A protein has these predicted regions:
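N-terminal membrane-anchoring alpha-helices
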Residues: 1-64
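A short acidic, helix-capping loop that chelates divalent metal ions and anchors anionic groups
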Residues: 135-142, 230-234
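A cross-domain feature marking catalytic cores of carbohydrate-active enzymes
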Residues: 79-81, 106-108, 130-132, 170-173, ...
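Acidic-and-aromatic substrate-binding clefts and catalytic sites of carbohydrate-active enzymes
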Residues: 82-86, 106-114, 137-145, 170-178, ...
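C-terminal domain-boundary segment and adjacent tail
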Residues: 49-70, 234-277
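Charged helix-capping and loop-helix junction motifs
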Residues: 146-151, 206-211, 237-244
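His/Asp/Glu-enriched short active-site or ligand-binding loop at hydrolase and phosphoryl-transfer sites
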Residues: 175, 180-217, 256-267
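Active-site beta->alpha N-cap acidic-glycine motif
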Residues: 50-139, 150-153, 157
Length: 277
């Protein structure tokens, strides 16, 4: 709630800057450099917020699990950019061996291309969430209509093919702009980024990827790995093959439980219902 309030106040402040700058320019034409500078600074702030995946300035954003889930020592393992038929089946087998659940942020186009694999993810007890339809690298440059098309097409594809309706959205590379928040509200989606990531699309050293994920690891963390676009190790294997089992062993050693984001959401809702009014 505090983060949502901060987002609303920031939007009001941004609008006020524009109105004040315009009024000042009309009333005092010689003040136009100050007005232009204020507007430019405001837009620079908006751009910086969009380039910071964990920012909450542009709207509500899960960077950690809710308090109730954190108190239960839950951790969310999220896996992006699939499904990939060359990688995802083995990832599912690793999760099965450890009795772990994960959240797969899937690209809608890949869900359409690999329908049975997407259904298999859900059948094995994991959740599939929305990662846009085409994962365009320029997602943060899209206008509201194009952004809604990306989100909506993925939402429809995932729900139609798997029978599971996503509750969460993660922007491609985590980058976004102010148009995204109203789009997500329209589709009743919660933005989710991460607490820590392994940079496993560019780092082939499994030990280094693992260290990035477990350094400071605590209940409530949201961790990011990739089954799609995964870096390969010296043997040509996706780095997630080595990182994921070691990560799950580390979670068990620290008495942390991997859960889906949807399970964490339910846990938070149940805790709210139990709390005295």
């Amino acid at each position: 709630m505090a983060r949502q309030t901060a987002s609303v106040l920031w939007k009001i402040s941004s609008a006020a800057i524009h109105v004040t700058a315009a009024a000042a320019t009309v009333a005092h034409p010689h003040a136009w450099p100050w007005a232009l500078g204020a507007v430019a600074a405001n837009h620079a702030t908006i751009t910086a917020a969009g380039l910071w995946p964990r920012s909450t300035l542009l709207g509500p954003n899960w960077t950690r699990l809710p308090t109730a889930a954190a108190a239960e020592r839950s951790v969310a393992v999220s896996i992006d950019d699939g499904p990939d038929p060359a990688v995802t089946p083995h990832v599912l087998d690793i999760l099965d061996r450890h009795g772990a659940q994960a959240t797969f942020f899937c690209i809608g186009r890949r869900v359409v291309e690999h329908r049975e694999l997407a259904r298999e993810i859900v059948r094995r007890g994991h959740s599939i969430e929305n990662h846009s339809f085409g994962h365009p690298n320029y997602f943060s440059l899209l206008g509201p209509r194009a952004m809604a098309a990306q989100v909506g097409a993925a939402q429809e594809a995932i729900a139609t093919i798997t029978g599971y309706t996503p509750r969460f959205f993660r922007a491609p590379a985590g980058l976004r702009n102010p148009f995204l928040d109203p789009v997500l509200r329209r589709f009743e989606l919660q933005l989710a980024s991460w607490t820590r990531r392994g940079f496993d699309t560019v780092t082939s050293d499994a030990g280094l990827v693992l260290q990035r994920l477990v350094h400071g690891l605590a209940g409530g963390d949201i961790l990011l790995l990739h089954d799609g676009n995964a870096a390969r190790d010296a043997r040509g294997a996706p780095v997630i093959y080595e990182v994921l089992p070691r990560l799950l062993d580390e979670l068990a050693a620290r008495e942390l439980t991997p859960v889906t984001l949807n399970a964490a959401l339910r846990s938070s809702a149940n805790a709210s219902m139990r709390s005295p009014s």
